């Protein structure tokens, strides 16, 4: 019980997770800056090399290699080892593969490899250069997980693997994404930096201008590459290599021969085909994957009159034909994860190779000196051969012979051992010459090795020579094309939309849809799908290339391209705006709908209950970035109770404003200033404290009507309201009563020509064209009344009009609209 310690769970968890984080950072996910390998990759290469599973020998079952690696060096799941081995064999993931594999090792389509019991593997030839000289005490070794064997903590790496093959991985708090590069270019940059240790980044980039992906493609953005090489972080555009191919009959097809690095080809083809299926861009007939053993090929066949460049631009922008590659060059440097630039990577590699060459030279020198000592002894033996033979024959045994040689002729222990084990056939004249030549060679070698160890310039010359040998043997052309500037993809969205005729309908409650002419013509107008408590306020024929603007009572405007509206049957209710517009309020209603071809020209006038008025330009309503999810303001309301009464296009006529208490004011529309969307406007009419605006409309006829809440209706001449100025009180159009006073419910122009466009929202039902302008009134008890407005006689300005029925005064008006 004395070993029990009381510790807080917080401290224990923090300390243990810290250990775990350090382990996975250093021992799992991040590469070493010197050899560019993660621990599992290093163990795979070392174990296969140790077992003799190298390129000059036959292939060996992958399962055997995986078992040896797992049993001796990597005590984790066999799948993690096999997956790492497979990745090192995939030529679309690595610029230079380190493992050669027979059998199915996966594909660019994301297909899994065959099980390890079916595949065979061996080290590639270039992988041998990563392990070169490892037996010469060139790198530190550490005990394996069970202290039964030692493994290298880094490989000698005769070429800069970190840059050549790149790396990617995620650990606790760190991630790395280092792109692959061209072997020749990397070696050229290393050689230049050996000669110029303080070389500028600009100069190094003359030799190493950018990444070189195994899948090719086009890399755009020289400035971002420079930034990444300087700081370790940056982002470049990687674009597929494409060409337009002519077909018979004047048709074309887009051919893709190279795709961005680490893009799944099958998923890419599926996404391109989804564009075709969903008709997101018209003109694609078929998408085919024609890849075979000769190379990658994706064919996108187009219709005869299709705009191939526009379609290609769309696919580049909205599929993985073009992607962004994010540099995040993090590597383990002196047991610490660091974000490193190009100069740091190259200098760390040069420093590592310096240590390797010096340690190798020391090892070779010691070996040469040991051999020279033996050779010197053997040459001396041959000069006194008869005496030596006699001495050996007189000795009792091998040990006695060795002792006699050391005492009588002053041979060392090593020389004595070599003499007594010397085979008789070597005691010939030819062997003497051979030994003398070997002695000379050994002395020259020792001199050379001493120079390498003692003279830095000589050592660097060796380093450069060895790098150039690797380049000469394994150099291959650059696969990725570099372009200095990232091209901005411009898409003519109008050309992407198939122009079709359609009918657009909008209800006051916010339901909208588009309907094909076939469905619309197959039904009557009354059969429109809507809620019982809703009202259809807009139906109009339009083209899918046009735009819909919806203005609400709360001063918001909603934009929708016609082609984005849900295509439904005429009898369907439609899509409610709250499904997509996050700020569409429960009490908000659609006041006015307008279909426009462009936003270049046009003015609107908005009038609020508080009597404020403004004009604003349609240009300001051009689509905003978040139009799919949010509306934007077209007028600022004075308070929470304020509402927009009228919104309509502006014509160069007078405006007539009528208040609930019966005041009417007429003034020129030119008096209303054009203001920005967020302004509240200017005072249109001078309201009394208990009054508010009921209606506003443009004066386009000689008369107008006034309907009160009690159901009284009259028609009066526009001239009875003479033109004055904005912000006045106006004239009364009702006679004040002490009991049951009349209040204006609705007012509007009476059109003598019913085909003329009406600019009051409440009278704007363009879908119904009748011979007469009708006023429909629904009472609170559900009674419906229809009155032909032109049949009404003109009344005096101060009269209260006539009731539309004997009982309407008691029922009162619930809804009124013109059609």
UniProtKB/Swiss-Prot annotation:
Site (Interaction with DNA): 38, 74, 76, 87, 93
Keyword Cell membrane (UniProt): yes
Catalytic machinery residues: 118 (o-(5'-phospho-dna)-tyrosine intermediate)
Name the UniProt record assigns to this protein: DNA topoisomerase 4 subunit A
GO biological process: chromosome segregation; DNA topological change
Documented EC number(s): 5.6.2.2
Family, per entry: Belongs to the type II topoisomerase GyrA/ParC subunit family. ParC type 2 subfamily.
Source organism: Streptococcus pyogenes serotype M18 (strain MGAS8232)
Transition state stabilizer (site feature) positions: 117
Keyword Transferase tagged: no
Alphabetized UniProt keyword annotations: Cell membrane, DNA-binding, Isomerase, Membrane, Topoisomerase
Subunit structure: Heterotetramer composed of ParC and ParE.
Reactions performed catalytically: ATP-dependent breakage, passage and rejoining of double-stranded DNA
PROSITE patterns (alphabetical): TOPO_IIA (PS52040)
Pfam families assigned to the protein according to its UniProt record, in alphabetical order: DNA_gyraseA_C, DNA_topoisoIV
Domain Topo IIA-type catalytic intervals: 30-496
Localization, UniProt: Cell membrane
Membrane topology, record value: Peripheral membrane protein
Job description of the protein: Topoisomerase IV is essential for chromosome segregation. It relaxes supercoiled DNA. Performs the decatenation events required during the replication of a circular DNA molecule.
GO MF, any single term: ATP binding
């Amino acid at each position: 019980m004395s070993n029990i310690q009381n510790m807080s769970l917080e401290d224990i968890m923090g300390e243990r997770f810290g250990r775990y984080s350090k382990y996975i950072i250093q021992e799992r996910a991040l590469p070493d800056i010197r050899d560019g390998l993660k621990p599992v990759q290093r163990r795979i290469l070392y174990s296969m090399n140790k077992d003799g599973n190298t390129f000059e020998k036959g292939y060996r079952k992958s399962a055997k290699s995986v078992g040896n690696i797992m049993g001796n060096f990597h005590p984790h799941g066999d799948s993690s080892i096999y997956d790492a081995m497979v990745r090192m064999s995939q030529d679309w993931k690595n610029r230079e593969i380190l493992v050669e594999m027979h059998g199915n090792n996966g594909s660019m389509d994301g297909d899994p490899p065959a099980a390890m019991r079916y595949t065979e593997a061996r080290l590639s030839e270039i992988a041998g250069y990563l392990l070169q000289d490892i037996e010469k005490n060139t790198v530190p070794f550490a005990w394996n997980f069970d202290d039964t064997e030692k493994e290298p903590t880094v490989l000698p790496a005769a070429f800069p693997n970190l840059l050549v093959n790149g790396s990617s991985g995620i650990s606790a708090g760190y991630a790395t994404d280092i792109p692959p590069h061209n072997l020749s270019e990397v070696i050229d940059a290393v050689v230049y930096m050996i000669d110029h240790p303080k070389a500028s980044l600009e100069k190094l980039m003359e030799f190493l201008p950018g990444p070189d992906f195994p899948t090719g493609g086009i890399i755009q953005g020289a400035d971002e590459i420079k930034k990444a090489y300087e700081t370790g972080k940056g982002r470049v555009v990687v674009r597929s290599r494409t060409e337009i191919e002519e077909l018979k009959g004047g048709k074309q097809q887009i051919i893709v021969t190279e795709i961005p690095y680490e893009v799944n080809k099958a998923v890419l083809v599926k996404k391109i085909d989804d564009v075709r299926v969903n008709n997101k861009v018209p003109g694609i007939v078929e998408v085919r994957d024609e890849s075979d053993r000769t190379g990658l090929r994706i064919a996108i066949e187009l219709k005869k009159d299709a705009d191939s460049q526009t379609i290609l631009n769309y696919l580049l922008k909205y599929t993985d034909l073009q992607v962004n590659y994010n540099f995040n060059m993090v590597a383990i440097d002196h047991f610490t994860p660091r974000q490193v630039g190009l100069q740091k990577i190259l200098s760390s590699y040069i420093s590592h190779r310096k240590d390797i060459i010096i340690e190798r030279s020391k090892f070779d020198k010691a070996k040469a000196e040991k051999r020279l000592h033996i050779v010197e002894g053997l040459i001396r033996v041959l000069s006194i051969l008869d005496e030596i033979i006699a001495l050996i024959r007189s000795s009792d045994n091998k040990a006695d012979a060795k002792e006699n040689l050391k005492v009588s002729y002053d041979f060392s222990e090593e020389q004595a051992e070599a003499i007594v084990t010397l085979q008789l056939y070597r005691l010939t004249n030819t062997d003497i010459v051979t030994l003398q030549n070997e002695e000379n060679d050994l002395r020259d070698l020792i001199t050379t090795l001493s120079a390498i160890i003692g003279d830095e310039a000589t050592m660097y010359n060796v380093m450069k020579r060895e790098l150039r040998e690797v380049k000469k043997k394994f150099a291959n052309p650059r696969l990725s094309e570099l372009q200095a500037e990232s091209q901005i993809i411009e898409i003519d969205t109008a050309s992407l939309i198939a122009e079709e005729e359609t009918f657009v309908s909008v209800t006051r409650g916010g339901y909208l849809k588009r309907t094909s002419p076939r469905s619309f013509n197959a039904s009557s107008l009354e059969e429109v799908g809507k809620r019982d408590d809703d009202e259809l306020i807009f139906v109009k024929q339009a083209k899918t290339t046009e735009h819909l603007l919806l203005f609400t009572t709360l001063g918001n405007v909603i934009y929708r391209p016609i082609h984005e509206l849900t295509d439904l049957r005429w009898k369907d209710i439609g899509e409610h705006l709250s499904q997509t517009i996050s700020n569409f309020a429960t009490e908000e209603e659609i006041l006015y709908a307008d279909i426009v071809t462009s936003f270049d020209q046009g003015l609107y006038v908005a009038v609020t209950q508080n009597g404020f008025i403004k004009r604003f330009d349609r240009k300001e309503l051009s689509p905003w970035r978040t139009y799919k999810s949010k509306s934007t303001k077209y007028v600022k309301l004075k308070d929470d109770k304020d509402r927009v009464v009228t919104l309509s296009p502006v014509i160069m006529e007078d405006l007539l404003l009528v208040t609930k208490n019966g005041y009417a004011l007429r003034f020129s529309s030119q008096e209303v200033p054009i203001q920005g969307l967020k302004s509240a406007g200017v005072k249109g009419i001078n309201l009394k404290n208990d009054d508010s605006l009921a209606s506003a409309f443009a004066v386009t006829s000689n008369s107008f009507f006034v309907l009160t809440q009690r159901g009284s209706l009259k028609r009066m001449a526009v001239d009875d309201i003479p033109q004055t100025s904005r912000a006045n009180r106006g004239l009364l159009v009702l006679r004040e009563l002490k009991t049951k006073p009349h209040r204006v419910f609705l007012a509007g122009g009476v059109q003598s020509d019913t085909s003329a466009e009406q600019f009051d929202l409440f009278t704007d039902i363009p879908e119904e064209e009748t011979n007469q302008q009708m006023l429909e009134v629904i009472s609170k008890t559900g009674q419906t009344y229809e009155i032909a407005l032109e049949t009404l006689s003109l009344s005096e300005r101060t009269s209260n009009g006539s009731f539309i029925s004997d009982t309407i005064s008691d029922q009162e008006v619930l809804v009124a609209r013109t059609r």
